[in-house]
Every structure is written in structure tokens, then in C-alpha cells.
Amino acid sequence: MSSLPSLADRIRKAGFSCLRCGSCCRETEPGSNLVMVGQEEISDIMEYTGLSFGEIAEPYPDRILEGDLDYTFGWVLRRTGDRCRFLDESSCQIYPVRPWICRTYPFVLDENGLTIHPCEGTGQNVGSGDAEKIAQDICRRYAYEQEQDEKIRAIVRSGTIPAGRPVVIDAEGIKDYHG
């Protein structure tokens, strides 16, 4: 993985400033606006909006069917038509508590390094302090995702996935859903 200074340098060179156009919140191709969220993020949104868990999130749509097992991994923000349910015209209704993936878009850090997704905001001037803040957020997001993934792997390894009913496996455990 890249160091924080080298990430900040790549971000500075790519340039980025959010234009608040809302394009990243709309589906431009199937699944392009799926926003994976963890329990902590959902809880923050619940507290901020007063909405229930089910009004905010739904199971990740790709289900795995193996014999009597029916499961999926994690949650995504609900969508209304082709857009995130929290997109109002071109502004985010939950901006102060938006999920990690939204805070760090169009940048993604994984084991292969930094990926920059196509976005109208790239190529814009970004200050050095802003580039460092984005780099820090990307690193925090990567660590959070790794921690969540490890918890999910441990649950799967335990072999406790129940048969005969659809479930969601997330970092908190196994939850029933009506798929």
C-alpha cells in the first residue's frame, strides 16, 4: 500500500474538487451507484435523519445460493429509481454523515493501490491540505473495510450460516431478511 505522502501527491496531481453535480449518486450503468455501508455508518445516518434501519439500507443485491443456503454480504444504501434515496436534486441530504465511500469518491484504495474513477471533479485544483485530508480519509476507509471484511470472513469460516432462509452476513453477524 502507498504511503500517506505519496497518496496525497497522486491526489494533488490528479486534482479534485467536488462539483456537487450528483452524478456519482445516480446509476449510469447497472449497479454503478451501489453504496456499501457498515453498521456504524447506518447508525450515524439513523441518528442524523431519524429514519429506521430498513428505510436507510437494504441487503446487497447479489445473493449467493448454495444448496439450502441463501445469503449476501453486507448492506447498501436504498435507492429510489436510478438514484440514491438521499440525493435531492443534486445535493446530499446526509452530507455531514455520508458514508466513507461517498466521502472518498472518486478515489479508492485497495491492495493494488490507488484507483481514480471517472468524475467531472477530477482535474480541478486541490490544495495540499485538502489532498492530505482526502488521503487520510482513503486510508481510514481502507482500514475500516479491511476490518469489516475480516469479521465477515470469520463468520463465514465458523460455518454457522443457517439453511432455509435468506440472510445477510455483515461484520456484526448474521441477520435474517425477507428477500
Predicted regions and their residues:
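Short loop/turn segments that flank or connect secondary-structure elements
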Residues: M1-G179
